[in-house]
């Protein structure tokens, strides 16, 4: 991509969004895609009368790609900053033109799409078939894999219980109750807004049982 850096630099726009600031909303016209430099963004959509968090996008992740297509396309999801976040915006027209002539880049994006589709299908299957405790276990293990651990061995992301519930596809009340059960069973422990996994093997067993 080195030969494309001057062209990208001429078209991109870097900016910072504040915590809880909406980057784009479900149904907004597609204007381009976003790359996350630093920070954390929740990608979410309406699911009946609830909010469902599809994934989290932190350093190096991409946003808005699902909306690429025809000129009148709209974003099928929303994106909201969970903390101060630095983004790089690239207009849709330039990005699509780049894909048409850079086959290696297009292939990498296609592989990203395929992996994301597989994760989305797993999430929908879990929502339909898996009990809340299993879905919460999946959510916690995914967060650990994406964000890693801090110096206290907690998952290195500050997250509200409401967002955790939306990521697990459950109500706040159900997740609150299930987390208390997990604490009593020594599966997890809490440190402020952060969660430590005490028994990863047991959480994995909840998913596969």
Question: Can you name each region flagged by the protein language model?
Answer:
Residues 100-169:
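Polybasic "coupling" helices that flank or enter modular domains
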Residues 21-83:
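Cyclic nucleotide-binding regulatory domains
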Residues 143-209:
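Phosphate-/nucleic-acid-contacting segments
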Residues 15, 34, 55, 80, ...:
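Residues that recognize and position ribonucleotide moieties
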Residues 1-19:
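Short proline/glycine- and basic residue-enriched helix-capping loop/turn segments at helix->loop/beta transitions
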């Amino acid at each position: 991509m080195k030969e494309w850096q001057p062209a990208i630099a001429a078209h991109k726009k870097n900016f910072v969004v504040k915590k809880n600031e909406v980057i784009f909303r479900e149904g907004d016209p597609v204007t381009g895609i976003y790359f996350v430099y630093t920070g954390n963004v929740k990608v979410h959509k309406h699911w009946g009368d609830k909010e469902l968090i599809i994934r989290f996008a932190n350093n190096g992740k991409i946003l808005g790609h699902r909306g690429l297509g025809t000129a009148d396309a709209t974003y099928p999801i929303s994106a909201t900053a969970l903390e101060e976040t630095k983004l790089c915006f690239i207009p849709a027209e330039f990005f699509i033109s780049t894909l048409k002539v850079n086959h290696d880049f297009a292939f990498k994006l296609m592989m990203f799409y395929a992996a994301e589709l597989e994760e989305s299908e797993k999430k929908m299957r879990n929502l339909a078939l898996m009990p809340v405790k299993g879905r919460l276990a999946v959510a916690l293990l995914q967060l650990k894999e994406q964000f890693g651990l801090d110096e206290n061995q907690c998952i290195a992301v500050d997250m509200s219980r409401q967002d955790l519930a939306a990521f697990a596809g459950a109500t706040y009340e159900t997740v609150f109750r299930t987390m208390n059960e997990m604490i009593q069973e020594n599966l997890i422990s809490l440190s402020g807004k952060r969660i430590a996994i005490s028994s990863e093997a047991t959480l994995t067993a909840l998913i596969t049982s």
